[in-house]
C-alpha cells in the first residue's frame, strides 16, 4: 500500500536514521558558515553554507521523498528558482509561462 503524504512526513526522520549522539529525533539546523576538512584536498561535501549545507541537503531529499521524486533543489528565492529554470532546464526554443 502506498503511503500518504502525512505518513511520509511523519516517518521521514526514522527512515533516514538521522538521530545524533545527543538523542535528537529530528535533523538539526546547521547555522555555521564554513566547514572543516579532514586534510588538504579532501572535502566533507560542504564548503560554504551559501553554496551547500547539510540542512538544505536534508530538506531537498525530504521534499523529493514526499513528492515521489528522485531529487529536489532548494533556491534562496523565487527569482533564483526562475533563473535556474530558464538557464539550466529550458532549451533554445522552449516556452515559459509565468
Name the predicted role of every residue range:
Residues 34-83:
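Conserved N-terminal alpha-helix of the aminotransferase class I/II PLP-enzyme fold
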Residues 9, 18-19, 56, 90-92:
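Generic recognition of cysteine residues
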Amino acid at each position: 500500500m502506498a503511503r500518504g503524504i502525512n505518513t511520509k512526513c511523519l516517518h521521514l526522520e526514522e527512515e533516514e536514521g538521522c538521530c545524533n549522539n545527543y538523542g535528537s529525533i529530528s535533523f538539526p539546523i546547521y547555522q555555521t558558515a564554513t566547514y572543516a576538512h579532514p586534510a588538504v584536498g579532501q572535502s566533507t561535501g560542504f564548503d560554504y553554507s551559501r553554496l551547500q549545507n547539510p540542512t538544505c541537503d536534508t530538506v531537498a531529499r525530504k521534499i523529493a521523498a514526499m513528492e515521489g521524486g528522485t531529487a529536489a533543489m532548494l533556491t534562496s528565492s523565487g527569482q533564483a528558482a526562475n533563473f535556474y529554470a530558464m538557464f539550466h532546464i529550458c532549451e533554445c526554443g522552449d516556452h515559459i509561462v509565468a
